[in-house]
Amino acid sequence: MILAAQNSVFVHIRRGDYVGIGCQLGIDYQKKALEYMAKRVPNMELFVFCEDLKFTQNLDLGYPFIDMTTRDKEEEAYWDMLLMQSCQHGIIANSTYSWWAAYLIKNPEKIIIGPKHWLFGHENILCKEWVKIESHFEVKSKKYNA
């Protein structure tokens, strides 16, 4: 499916251990990133990776997507990494897991979008050619700038 897609884009949404401790990104980050990507990648095919099946079942990103969420993330982590790096472009979370998937994409014309704000002040973690999008962290529906 991903390999057959002409303009595949992965979106990684990290929740899991980030939820409740103030580390998960607000969904507006992914929406802004998708708006940016849609202007540059015609007919993009989105593949969403997340470890929270309940969350993705009700997710509205403003664009149609294929939900790649699996029930057992620990057993499927290597497979998700392989699938994400098989995409042509990527939108990463504030996670080194999706950072590596994006870094390993072989497309020399790849567009990678990452959050401007990372944990613990690691603001320069993105590669220089990657696009930084403004982001914030969410805690129990309250927004805090990182």
Can you name each region flagged by the protein language model?
Residues V41-I125:
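Donor-binding and catalytic core of enzymes assembling or modifying cell-surface/extracellular glycoconjugates
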Residues G121-A146:
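Leloir-type glycosyltransferase catalytic cores
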